[in-house]
């Protein structure tokens, strides 16, 4: 009887210990969903940018989820779940989308594509973190594409991982002046009704070229939906500039380049807009674009960049300076979640958003696909870049200014 009682007590202790062990380990084996929202343009002339961003986000999330997921504050494993919204590159729709996202379980939103959406959208966010008198949305937005200069400073909740075009074109024109000292004049062309194109010509290219010693001999303007460029190219032909600097997106860039070829306008060099360093440009007018030079913050020059490009291709997308930022954004969000005690529970959504915002604001550097990215106090990025040129309907690295 004593032996039986002892065995029973031992069994009870064993079961109690096992139960306790099970309870303690369950927190570590549990899996939670971390909701992420993506948004951008998937309709209209520039829809390829949003489509590629969605493909990259899917690829990056699949990679993380299939390689261990994300470690949460209590040791549980988190798996990302993406919901992507089309804002149609319209400010009012972008604002509506983000208000909708704020009412979901998403802890962060990655987007938008268009600067004309980002600028007013950032304006509806709380301007200063912790300001009780400001009823603006307290939702971290981490932009991958909208590139117009200086937008992140609008709100403490706005962050961007986009290249600094002012630095890129300043360096490019200075380098071109050294490499081609015989070239003296520049003619500019701009997609006047698109915020990014307009800003980059008037505030960046038009400033950087004369600063490097070039003489500006004229400019031409057109609209995003234009299909005829006869008049603009005639003006280029008349100016006889050594360099044509084009600030427009792939659709109108190709239209312009084809018209230049038709009118036999052959400048010594053509400089393009960052956003046109994409496969869409080469697919639309590879022969006409031959030789165009564009600064870009993405090229498949590292193992990480090639890996991201391959995984994106599996999702039906292509990787360029915009969509590559979306991959980096997901990796940065994972890093911030793991370092800042995110719980990913239904009752911690707003607290998690605040922790992610604070974590992003605290970053000084992040790991990029082609090198280290510096973070600024205003929530912007200072990204490494190279000069790419179109060669045989492919993008090739012409020069790496870091080397």
Residue map of PLM features:
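Beta-alpha junction/loop-to-helix N-cap segments that form part of ligand/metal-binding clefts
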Residues: 48-55, 70-151, 161, 222-229, ...
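Extracytoplasmic "Venus flytrap"
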Residues: 37-60, 85-91, 190-200, 318-324
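Segments of small-molecule ligand-sensing domains
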Residues: 313-323, 334-399
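Extracellular/periplasmic bilobed ligand-binding domains
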Residues: 123-131, 201-297, 399
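Hydrophobic alpha-helical segments within soluble ligand-binding/sensing domains
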Residues: 94, 160-185, 229-230, 253-254, ...
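Periplasmic-binding protein-like
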Residues: 101-114, 134-144, 186-190, 240-250, ...
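An alpha-beta-alpha
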Residues: 42, 154-221, 243
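Extracellular/periplasmic periplasmic-binding protein-like sensory domains
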Residues: 260-329, 339-340, 390, 395-402
């Amino acid at each position: 009887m004593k032996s039986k009682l002892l065995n029973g007590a031992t069994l009870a202790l064993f079961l109690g210990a096992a139960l306790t062990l099970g309870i303690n380990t369950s927190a570590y084996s549990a899996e939670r969903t971390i909701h992420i929202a993506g948004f951008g343009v998937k309709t209209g002339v520039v829809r390829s940018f949003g489509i590629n961003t969605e493909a990259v986000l899917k690829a990056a999330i699949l990679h993380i989820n299939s390689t261990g997921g994300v470690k949460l504050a209590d040791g549980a494993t988190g798996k990302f779940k993406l919901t992507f919204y089309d804002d149609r590159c319209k400010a009012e729709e972008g604002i509506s989308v983000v208000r909708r996202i704020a009412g979901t379980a998403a802890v962060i939103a990655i987007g938008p594509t268009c600067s004309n959406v980002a600028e007013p959208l950032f304006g509806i966010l709380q301007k200063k973190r912790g300001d009780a008198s400001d009823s603006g949305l307290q939702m971290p937005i981490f932009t991958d594409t909208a590139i117009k200069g200086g937008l992140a400073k609008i709100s403490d909740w706005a962050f961007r991982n986009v290249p600094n075009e002012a630095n890129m074109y300043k360096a490019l024109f200075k380098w071109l002046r050294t490499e081609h000292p015989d070239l003296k004049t520049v003619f500019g062309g701009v997609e006047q009704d698109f915020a990014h194109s307009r800003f980059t010509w008037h505030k960046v290219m038009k400033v950087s070229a004369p600063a490097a010693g070039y003489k500006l001999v004229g400019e031409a303007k057109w609209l995003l939906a234009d299909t005829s460029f006869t008049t603009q190219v005639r003006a280029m032909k008349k100016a006889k500039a050594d360099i044509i600097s084009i600030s427009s997106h792939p659709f109108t860039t190709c239209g312009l380049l084809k018209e230049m070829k038709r009118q036999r306008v052959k400048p010594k060099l053509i400089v393009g807009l960052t956003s046109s360093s994409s496969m869409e440009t080469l697919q639309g007018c590879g022969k006409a674009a031959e030789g165009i030079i564009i600064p870009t913050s993405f090229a498949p020059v590292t193992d990480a960049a090639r890996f991201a490009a391959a995984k994106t291709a599996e999702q039906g997308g292509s990787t360029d300076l915009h969509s590559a930022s979306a991959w980096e954004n997901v990796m940065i969000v994972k890093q911030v979640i793991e370092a800042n005690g995110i719980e990913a529970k239904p009752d911690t959504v707003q607290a998690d958003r605040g922790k992610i915002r604070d974590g992003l604001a605290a970053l000084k550097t992040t790991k990029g696909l082609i090198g280290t990215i510096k973070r600024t106090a205003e929530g912007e990025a200072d990204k490494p870049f190279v000069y790419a040129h179109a060669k045989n309907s492919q993008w090739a690295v012409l020069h790496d200014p870091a080397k």
